[in-house]
Structure formats: C-alpha cells, structure tokens
Regions:
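C-terminal substrate-binding subdomain of Rossmann-fold SDR/epimerase-dehydratase oxidoreductases
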Residues: 160-164, 168-265
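Conserved cofactor-binding/catalytic machinery of classical short-chain dehydrogenase/reductase
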Residues: 48, 75-78, 90, 118-119, ...
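NAD(P)-dependent short-chain dehydrogenase/reductase
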Residues: 111, 121-175, 180-184, 188, ...
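NAD(P)H-binding glycine-rich loop region in Rossmannoid oxidoreductase-like domains
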Residues: 32-71, 103
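N-terminal Rossmann/SDR dinucleotide-binding element
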Residues: 1-48
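Conserved Rossmann-fold NAD(P)-dependent oxidoreductase catalytic core, especially the SDR/UDP-sugar
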Residues: 51, 74-111
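Glycine-rich NAD(P)-binding loop of the Rossmann-fold in SDR/ketoreductase-type enzymes
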Residues: 63, 67-75, 110, 114-115, ...
Length: 265
C-alpha cells in the first residue's frame, strides 16, 4: 500500500495460508532450506532488509537450545553475511524489551532475550566491517486480529466466551501492549528512513505504548469491551521466574512513530 515491492524469506513449513489472498498476491516468496540466503538476497535485490524471524520461548528446556540458537542467532548471521556479500546495507531488526530486565541496560529475562542480545553483538561486526546501517526495534507484548498465538489476551477472551475458569498468577505484573498494525508501521517507517539514506536514524528504539497496566487492569478493560465477565482465578498460578513486574520504560521512540490503537492500553 505504501508503494513497496516486498519479498519474503519463508521456511518450507511456513503456513502461507494464514495470509490473505491479497497479501499473498503482492509478496514474492523465497523458500529458505539452508545455505541459500546469499542466492536469495542476490535474486531479491532488496533496498532494505527487515529481519523478524525468531523463536520465542518464555522458558526453555535443554532440548530447546538448538532451535533457539538456530532461529535467533544462526539464521540472522547467515542473513547478514548474505547482505554483506551482495552489498546490501540497510537493515531493520526486531529486538525485545526483555533484554532489559528491571530496566537494566542489559539483563536478559530469559534465554530467548539472551539470544537476541547475542545477535546484536554479531550485527556490530557487520556494521563495522560491511558498512551496514541498522535500526533495531525493541518490541513489547503484541496483539491483533487473527493472532493464532496462545497469548494472554486470547486466553482471557476465550475464557470470557466459554465461561471456563482461567487459572492465573496474582495479576499484578504490568504489561505494555502494542497492536500489530502499529508495530508494522514502525518497521515501515524505519525502512523508509534507511531507504532515504538517513544514517542519523540508526540505533535502537522502543515500540512501546508508553504506558503499562497490570494484568488485572487489562482483564477489567477487556471485560468492558466484551461485555462479559472473565472467570479468572487470580493467584492460582505463581509468577514465573524473573517475572517482569514493570516493563522497561527508558527506550527512545522512533521519530515520527505513534500508536493508533488504544483499545486496551
């Protein structure tokens, strides 16, 4: 809609049927099967690369480590190498607010966040040796229509509709929720800046609602929106290890970006 030609790198297992027919018709898909990224980047000839691929796990088991490293470190490194070999220098990537436990400059909430930080260390090498211009967008909790993930808003809405009791933590942890459309707008805006050779915009930014509400407050707001009571059993579950009680709040906002969706927050 903004005049961009879009190419996407997907896995053989990617569910493209989850995309609308209109979207599928406007995107040039390239299937990644390992060791093909240099050829894919050469064929696509991108002006800007946006890197969103990741494996998110709030908590991991030992068996999850290879997949976490492959998705969050190995794939991204191969992508950077492919960009360097094809002289593609503009790069937008997704980080996470969970790299900043208790508001620290760097303290990973979990191994997922640690792999994100590890990738950024690798990116630094390509910035210095291949002349990459990079914008990092630190994401918080996201929501939106058609979300198939079993995230907290979906669970709350499902409980309201079915009437089945939902076992939850005490609910005092705060969340910073941003609609997926607003997240997409941040990526579009960052890409436009880089396409216009705005090197001054390089750096990291928070894609944040600018406010945080407790899970209890979010549930109460959702009840009003749905017109139904949520049968929540508060305190039935303990807080997770390293639960984020207060989201990171000191990140700078990408110039020109502001959220439009304020239904929940």
């Amino acid at each position: 809609e903004a005049g961009w030609e879009v190419a996407a790198i997907v896995r053989p297992s990617s569910d493209l049927e989850a995309l609308s027919v209109a979207v599928r018709g406007r995107v040039d898909f390239h299937v990644y099967v390992g060791g093909t990224l240099t050829d894919i980047v050469r064929e696509a000839k991108p002006t800007v690369v946006s890197h969103l691929a990741s494996l998110y796990l709030a908590a991991h088991e030992s068996a999850d480590i290879p997949a976490l490293v492959a998705s969050n470190i190995l794939f991204g490194t191969e992508l950077l190498e492919a960009m360097a070999k094809n002289d593609v220098r503009r790069f937008v990537f997704a980080g996470t607010s969970w790299q900043h436990y208790q508001g620290m400059q760097y303290s990973p909430v979990n191994l997922y966040a640690a792999t994100k930080e590890a990738f950024e260390a690798i990116l630094r090498y390509y910035e210095e040796t291949a002349g990459l211009y990079a914008v990092g967008l630190k994401l918080f909790d996201t929501y939106g229509e058609g979300d198939t993930r079993r995230k907290i808003l979906a669970l709350l809405e499902e409980a309201a509709k079915t009437g089945e009791e939902l076992a939850l933590s005490p609910g005092e942890q705060k969340l910073d929720l941003v609609h997926v459309d607003d997240v997409a707008e941040a990526f579009r805006l960052a890409a436009e800046y880089l396409a216009a050779d705005r090197a001054d915009i390089c750096g990291e930014y928070a894609v944040s609602a600018g406010t945080a509400l407790s899970l209890r407050e979010i549930a109460a707001r959702l009840e009003k929106l749905l017109g139904k009571k949520i049968p929540a059993r508060w305190g039935a579950r303990p807080y997770r290890s390293r639960e984020v009680m207060e989201p990171w709040s000191t990140g700078r906002i990408l110039p020109g970006w502001q959220r439009r969706h304020k239904e929940i927050m």
